[in-house]
Amino acid sequence: MTPRREALAFAAALGALVSALLGESLTLGKVLSPADVLYAQASFRGDRPPTYEPANRLLIDPVLQFQPWLEFSRRMLRGGRLPLWNSRAGLGVPHLANGQSAVFDPFQIIAYLGTLPEALAWIAASRLWVAGFGMFLLARRWGLGGWGRWFAGLAFPLCGFMVLWLQYTVASAAAWLPWCLWATDRALIGRRWRDSAALGLVVAASLFGGHVQTTAHVLIASGLYVLTQIRSAGRRGLTCWAAGIGVGVLIAAVEVVPLGFYLAKSPVWADRSTSKPSAWSVPAPRLMDAACTALPYLYGSQRRGMPNLARALGVHNLNESAGGFAGLATLVWLAPIGAMSGGRWRAVAILGVVGALGAFGVPPVANLLRAIPVVSVTDNRRLTLWVAFALVLLGGRGLDQIMETRRNQWFGRWVVAWVVVAVVLAGGAATVVALGPRLRERARSHERAESASSHVGRALRFTPGYLAGAAVQLGALAAVAGLVRRGRLGPSAARAIVGSIALLDLFAFAYGVNPAIERGDHRPGSPVIDRLREVAPFPMRVVGVGAELPPNTLMLYGLADCRNYDSVELAASLRWLDALYEPGSSRTSRRPVTWAGVARAADRLRASGVAAAVGASEPPAGLFEAVERVGPVWIARLGGPRPERFGPGDGRFDVIVNPSATPRRLVIPETYDPGWRAWVEGVEVAVKAESAALLAVDLPAADLPRWVALRYDPPEVRWSLVASGVGLCLAALGLIAPKKAVFGVGAAGRVGLESILRPTPGRRAGSPTEGRDADGPLHV
């Protein structure tokens, strides 16, 4: 099979795998969304019991961030406007600049051109497909045989990191990691302009993905690989690679530059810097988290029906602890064999080890990461991306080299260790079953007997079976290893069995993590929402009390909140409404809100256009203009004078001001930002900050009505658009450059060919070992 036909065959197989994983949402009419978490609120619960459990209650961010932001971006772009400003959150906030809105993410084009919510599943599927196909190309470029490259390409989209973060912008950025290393290798070896341009496009795609921390991890991985190849790459190779990185950052300037300006106006950077421990402190390694790299559901999860033991044991949630999962067989068998191959595979193994040490807080790597500027304020738990990536690649290499287990004396002792662990796991399963009656009895005597009994019941139903399943898998692997070592199992059969065990393990883990819900559950109706549309229609605002209507929930229904569910917020609006929130260590509008806080901040809430507060508990008497109960929820209306309010919002205000015999100040209840501009009768005037928080324009006396226009037009966006255009032009020039156009002049660098001393696994009999038609690896 030619390389092109093999790539097409793999692309089809990968598409079938992704379709099997997400089939309910892609073809059966369901919606890939965790939006049923809204039923946990009294406002949406309806006739469901208070104990209603969503399909995956951990996945709240996609509902409160990415889905409403995607819909907002789509509506604005289809209306012919760049989504610069969002008036429906946080008294108005920058939208394009918040980074995670991912306005230019290539995957989101599916939603811009298609329909929602159907596009949500296709976006997720495209992320997985791109990640898998990129891994296949990288594995083929690095010389893996047919078994190895197919395994790597099919396993990576099923790994813990890609599956657990699938509905986050994290996955959009991470999907380009294999492509980045593939393009990096091409740039170091080919040293052509087109190689540099290809790398630039990949880097830009990752940056546009909407999670700059993950892209930083992608670029650091690329840089570490360059260090391992620095001698063979030469000056021209390094120049080609650096130029590609520079072009990529330049293309993504419209994503990166506004984010930088937004961070400068937000307290998040300072809060994270102060909350991080000293680089010299020695943290306690999160070794219990690391166990999830082998058994992701060891402590259960927040999926429906599963026990959630993580919090009680001090373990992080599933997304943070199990991101490095790549299959039990990959971890214990294939990856160790692959790491023994030396060369670049040893470098891949080092990347995985460093990622694990950083992700699980093991000194001295954890200390080093805290000492590096910028990296010190990123969430390095997400370095499990490196762990999963390395395990999958090494697993592919190990699958190709699986017969090497017959020659390694240590491998026999390693298999014995599997058997011991399998016995321990089986014993653990039996112990949990034996302790069942005692645990149930203790639960019934607990202060919260119903809740405790529910948790114990889940643990008894799930944990023994899960531990027993892991024990059976290890036992099966030990049996296969024994057959291989005795020569009773040939290479193809061994690869097929072990590869299938690993892929089935990954598929079983991944299936159902991202719920497919009924279409009616994606945007549930609520009499509370219907009433708010009457008493507080946009552009008026609402604030939720307690657990009701978390920030950004109302965006889903076209309403506005005075809070913002985002890690980056404007310091001005947070200071303005500081009295609303209960004290907390971080300055964020996700802090708890109580009725007492609403009373403290009532005057400023009114000045900000907040018309109502909603809570599941009854508000104190005498504090509000009117109070009504809608089902199980109370709606309190804030009385008093209202500010002038003008439409349409979202970065544009057009106002007709009545005549006035004296000068006056026009105040608009929207957060002040230096990017705002104003015109009175077509003449530009200064925009000022009222109380250091709200928009204000000073107007002279006038006998006639005046037209006032305000536009959000930050200069950094205009500058960065120009820079992105220049970057795209450079990339286009590189792609159309002649194939022989290389960086630098002068004599070519030294080239060394690695001799192939034994047949490469998967090579056809009589096929060439060199040149374009070679079936084996050619290292240059």
Model-derived segments and spans:
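Hydrophobic alpha-helical membrane-insertion signals
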Residues: P3-P94, L263-P267, Y511-N514, D521-R523, ...
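Active-site lumenal/periplasmic loops and adjacent helix-entry segments of GT-C-fold
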Residues: S25-W142, G148-W176, P285-S321, A678, ...
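Periplasmic/ER-lumenal interhelical loops and adjacent helix-loop junctions
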Residues: L38-M76, R81, G248-G338, V377-L385, ...
